Amino acid sequence: MQTIFKELTKSFEETLLESLIKNEKKEEFEKIRKNLINQASKEEFGDYQCNICLVLSKIYKSNPREIAIAFIETLKENKKISNLCENLEIAGPGFINIKLKNKVLIEAIKSNIKCPRAGVPLSHKNNIYSKKKVIVDFSSPNIAKEMHVGHLRSTIIGDSISKIFEFRGYIVLRLNHIGDWGTQFGMLITQLKDLYSSDLKEIDRIKISDLVEFYKASKKRFDNETEFQKRSREEVVQLQSGDKKSIEAWKLLCNQSRKEFDQIYKTLNIKIKERGESFYNPFLKSIIEDLNYKKILIEDQGAKCVFLDGMTNKEGNPLPLIIQKKDGGFNYATTDLAALRYRFTKEPYGDNAARIIYVTDHGQSNHFAGVFQVAKRANWIPKDCEVNHVPFGLVQGIDGKKLKTREGDTIKLKDLLSESVKRAKEDLLKRLENESRFENDDFVLNTSKVIGIGAVKYADLSQNRITNYQFSFEKMLSLNGNTAPYLLYTLVRISGINRKNNMTEEAINLESISYSHDLEWKLIRKLLKFDEVIISIEKDLMPNRLCNYLFELCKTFNRFYDQVPILKGEIDTKISRLTLCALTEKTLKLSLELLGIETLERM
């Protein structure tokens, strides 16, 4: 209902300025007009609410209800508002409850049925985003290390945010900032050369069966063998200087890891462009030079750093963001600054981004706050551009502690996904047996995979990303509650109704639709909130808003399905109700796609 909302807001603003806001108060009005109208907090309050009279009462030192009475009388004289609104009434100390006319809602439903996007508008093409990109930096595993549950959160939250921006019409660049550079490669390459010295001439033939064990063995030698440690440090210098054999060994390690990552991305159906830390190596020196030139960089105890405004240590002293270590080496902050500057730089010398979104765990919040502050002070973030950190909490076990194996190790992501699919298959086979129903192996395998992977994704996305959440296969695979199986089952139910009744868009006669049942209007109002939910996520980057909306939509539809005789009554009544089924199906399918969850025709 964004179109209605905008029209309503504009009319309210015009009426306020014409009738209540005196010239000397217009500057104050500009500060408060942003949230002039909001969605009603409860259904009984109508469709929207306006609390401006409470705010104005403080400015004018007047009774808010008296202001509301005068405002409503003026609003009723506005033709646009009288065409949109069935009722305007005062509630409580001075709230104005707004209820839209039924005919306005029906016209909106007709429009959404015809719209392949279920009423969600494309972003405006005449603004900064018409040529510039939105960059979403997510997933970002490290070479020679296994992807774990922390990478799951970054990967699926980042994927969903990317999908929502793409759906809105933005040019989105999904970047995988993998950890493919750093001092750890010295020990890995040294270990590689020690184990496969004779094969390095034919490096493509080397297969490292278990990179994680290879990493652990390398680390153990580095911690315990002085001579190996010395050679590893020398290897880092050779790698950074571009030694041919070192580069080849480094590429081998990256390629082996990439195969592992790609298997998981295939399972999760994730599309992402790899651009690792190494890509920014040529730009690191210029970061130091630019910060020096702008007199932002300070040398402290041999290291070059920027002291951050408003960020202090326990002693109350300003925190430093170290840009270059005292040994001359660079670190994550240097690379992140180089990446940020490159991404905002215009093409062909950069990505030409208008907005950059980083999806990482909340443990990196201070790091990114420091990086963003330095970038702003260096004027690397254009005035009309935006940068956001999207932090998320930990995945915990049902005991409330960090999710680990029984042995205390971090759970591998591929093992977790396999276990979910396995349990989904077991549940499906039990259900088929209870229903005395036979399905072939392809059906069982595909359905198990869709439910198992979808359940893991949805369980994560449905949480407020900022908080920790407890991982439970039992809860996420349940057919009851706010779960992927519940949504998928509801969608299968609706799709079956529409298939049996040939409810294609071409078959719907929109001119004859009409509604009278209370549950019809509840479903209509829920369906018309879809665009507002999507646009709100674009602003605050909280995908759980879409999950909450879908759960409420499914509950509303199921009450409608159970209590309203959809296929009975006169033909116009039947078509009107089937029209709501068709729009619910479309909205559910689009939404699940935005969450990265595949759908099923049968379960």
UniProtKB/Swiss-Prot annotation:
Catalysed reaction, written as an equation: tRNA(Arg) + L-arginine + ATP = L-arginyl-tRNA(Arg) + AMP + diphosphate
Signal peptide annotation: none
Pfam families: Arg_tRNA_synt_N, DALR_1, tRNA-synt_1d
Gene Ontology terms, MF aspect: arginine-tRNA ligase activity; ATP binding
EC id: 6.1.1.19
Cellular component, GO annotation: cytoplasm
SMART domains linked to this entry: Arg_tRNA_synt_N (SM01016), DALR_1 (SM00836)
Protein localization: Cytoplasm
Superkingdom per UniProt: Bacteria
UniProt keyword annotations, A-Z: Aminoacyl-tRNA synthetase, ATP-binding, Cytoplasm, Ligase, Nucleotide-binding, Protein biosynthesis
Motif 'HIGH' region: where in chain: 141-151
Principal place of residence: cytoplasm
GO biological process entries: arginyl-tRNA aminoacylation
Assembly information from the UniProt record: Monomer.
Family: Belongs to the class-I aminoacyl-tRNA synthetase family.
Name of the protein in its database record: Arginine--tRNA ligase
Organism of this sequence: Prochlorococcus marinus subsp. pastoris (strain CCMP1986 / NIES-2087 / MED4)
This protein's encoding gene: argS
